[in-house]
């Protein structure tokens, strides 16, 4: 599980949903008949919320007011299991509140309650002390700037310098026209309008897009220059060439919070793949999910997977998995099998295996491998479907499909802390045990087997 530190402006989003069919007798304005009220985490907290939805561990740093809204906000974060030890109380300001009025799924007005003053000296010190204390244990840092007073120039540059000192990935969602504030960041995520305003350059074609991204890299020393282009997707610079990554969204209902989704998904994907094109494709898919919903919506890994051609981010090649595990300090558990017609016995076995460590990797026999082992009538379920079903189990972290008759190549490459096999190997040699620190034999739950299910189906349909 990746640890991400999110620093920025915390915003409470409040929604009034209703219908409007009458005009007020007091003034020529519509009357809203409220049918529903809802609250959600906004600003940097929405970035944190998106990261949680994608499976990260999140530490949030920002400021709320000493008011009821601030207390509710912190409680909502704790319910989402966000670490709030970096959320500071400012007695001189209110908690930033944005109220949106929605009529027939259309936002008609937004009312903002906020104070944008810079942080006082004590709060600045406490914020930077918290960042300095936490930064070494983080995998990545996100600065979510909504220009509400938390991320001024000095604080932003201090945090970026700290991140670079500790070789941490740091991404910034920028606000305002002075991009020197974000210089030396790993990546920033301006949209087209924001970048046009900052560079005084109309982004009306590939030539100017390329020029803008080159300015970000050469003038502001942004390692991975990028711009989000709404319905046109994302454009980025790679080896001084413009690369376009088209959008995947089919229907757009509400773009609220889409930028938060993009920076959250980019961060996690970059940490996993270290490939900007793959990260942009993943972020586009995540954005496509949230703009198809109303409000500050979230995208799950399963929803993103459905958009990415029925693939799943847990299903990886051995090369990609080794890349992810390169700096891993957690206990890795490995098991393997066919998992043809997934049943309760399989799920129970995998849950027990996961309990032995932190990361559970499943080596999955390919269709060709199963045919060689079990005959031409197997598998019943194809490898893509078997892999997707396994990926849907919360106890499974990664799946690698292998073509060989045994997983010895996988085990040798992965060198897991614990190798798990079924108890039927009690008097047999466990293949690959020499490459694992420990081997554990685990019994399957009695009364469940793929063969028994197949026989039951055959009997039922022969009657």
Swiss-Prot record:
Reactions this protein catalyses: D-glycero-beta-D-manno-heptose 7-phosphate + ATP = D-glycero-beta-D-manno-heptose 1,7-bisphosphate + ADP + H(+); D-glycero-beta-D-manno-heptose 1-phosphate + ATP + H(+) = ADP-D-glycero-beta-D-manno-heptose + diphosphate
One term under GO cellular component: cytosol
State the source organism's domain of life: Bacteria
A Pfam cross-reference name: PfkB
Q: Which UniProt keywords are given for this protein, alphabetically ordered?
A: ATP-binding, Carbohydrate metabolism, Kinase, Multifunctional enzyme, Nucleotide-binding, Nucleotidyltransferase, Transferase
Q: What Gene Ontology molecular function terms does this protein carry?
A: ATP binding; heptose 7-phosphate kinase activity; heptose-1-phosphate adenylyltransferase activity; phosphotransferase activity, alcohol group as acceptor
Tell me the segments the record calls region Cytidylyltransferase: 334-463
Q: Where is this region: Ribokinase?
A: 1-315
Q: Where is the active site?
A: 260
Q: In which pathway does it act?
A: Nucleotide-sugar biosynthesis; ADP-L-glycero-beta-D-manno-heptose biosynthesis; ADP-L-glycero-beta-D-manno-heptose from D-glycero-beta-D-manno-heptose 7-phosphate: step 1/4; Nucleotide-sugar biosynthesis; ADP-L-glycero-beta-D-manno-heptose biosynthesis; ADP-L-glycero-beta-D-manno-heptose from D-glycero-beta-D-manno-heptose 7-phosphate: step 3/4
Q: What class of enzyme is it?
A: transferase
- State any GO BP term from the record: ADP-L-glycero-beta-D-manno-heptose biosynthetic process
Residues holding ATP: 191-194
EC number of this enzyme: 2.7.1.167, 2.7.7.70
Taken from the UniProt record, the cysteine pairs bridged by disulfide bonds within this chain are none
Chain's role:
Catalyzes the ADP transfer from ATP to D-glycero-beta-D-manno-heptose 1-phosphate, yielding ADP-D-glycero-beta-D-manno-heptose.
| Membership in a protein family | In the N-terminal section; belongs to the carbohydrate kinase PfkB family. In the C-terminal section; belongs to the cytidylyltransferase family.
The protein in question is named Bifunctional protein HldE
Q: Which gene encodes it?
A: hldE
């Amino acid at each position: 599980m990746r640890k991400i530190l999110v620093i920025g402006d915390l915003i409470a989003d409040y929604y009034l949903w209703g219908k409007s069919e009458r005009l007020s007798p007091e003034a020529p304005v519509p009357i809203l008949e409220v049918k529903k009220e809802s609250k959600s985490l906004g600003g940097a907290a929405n970035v944190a919320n998106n990261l949680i939805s994608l499976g990260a561990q999140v530490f949030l740093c920002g400021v709320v007011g000493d008011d009821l809204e601030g207390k509710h906000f912190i409680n909502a974060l704790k319910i989402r299991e966000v670490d709030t030890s970096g959320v500071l109380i400012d007695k001189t300001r209110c908690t930033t509140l944005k109220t949106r009025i929605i009529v027939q799924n259309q936002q008609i007005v937004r009312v903002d309650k906020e104070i944008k003053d810079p942080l006082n000296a004590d709060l600045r010190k406490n914020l930077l002390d918290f960042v300095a204390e936490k930064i070494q244990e983080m995998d990545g840092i996100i600065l979510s700037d909504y220009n509400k007073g938390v991320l001024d120039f000095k604080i932003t540059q201090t945090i970026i310098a700290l991140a670079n000192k500790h070789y941490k990935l740091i991404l910034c969602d920028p606000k305002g026209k002075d991009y020197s504030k974000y210089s030396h960041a790993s990546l920033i995520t301006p949209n087209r309008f924001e970048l046009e305003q900052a560079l005084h350059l109309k982004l009306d074609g590939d030539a100017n897009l390329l020029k803008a991204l080159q300015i970000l890299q050469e003038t502001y020393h942004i390692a991975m220059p990028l711009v989000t282009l709404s319905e046109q997707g994302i454009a980025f610079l790679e080896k001084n060439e413009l690369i376009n990554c088209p959008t995947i969204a089919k229907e757009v209902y509400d773009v609220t919070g889409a930028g938060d989704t993009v920076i959250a998904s980019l961060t996690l994907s970059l940490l996993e793949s270290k490939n900007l094109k793959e990260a942009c494709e993943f972020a586009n898919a995540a954005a496509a999910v949230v703009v198809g919903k109303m409000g500050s919506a979230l995208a799950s890994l399963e929803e993103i997977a459905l958009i990415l051609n029925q693939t799943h981010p847990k299903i990886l090649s051995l090369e990609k998995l080794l890349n992810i595990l390169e700096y891993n300090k957690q206990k890795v558990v490995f098991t393997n099998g066919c998992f043809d017609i997934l049943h309760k016995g399989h799920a129970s076995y995998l849950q027990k295996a996961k309990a032995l460590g932190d990361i559970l990797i499943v080596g999955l026999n390919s269709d060709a491998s199963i045919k060689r082992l079990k005959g031409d009538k197997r598998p019943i379920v194809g490898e893509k479907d078997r892999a997707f079903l396994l990926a849907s189990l919360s106890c499974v972290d990664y799946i690698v499909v292998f073509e060989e008759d045994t997983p010895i190549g996988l085990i040798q490459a992965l060198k897991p802390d614990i190798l798990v096999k079924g108890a039927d190997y009690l008097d047999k040699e466990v293949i690959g045990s020499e490459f694992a620190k420990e081997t554990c034999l685990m019994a399957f739950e009695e009364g469940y087997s793929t063969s028994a299910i197949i026989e039951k189906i055959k009997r039922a349909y022969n009657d």
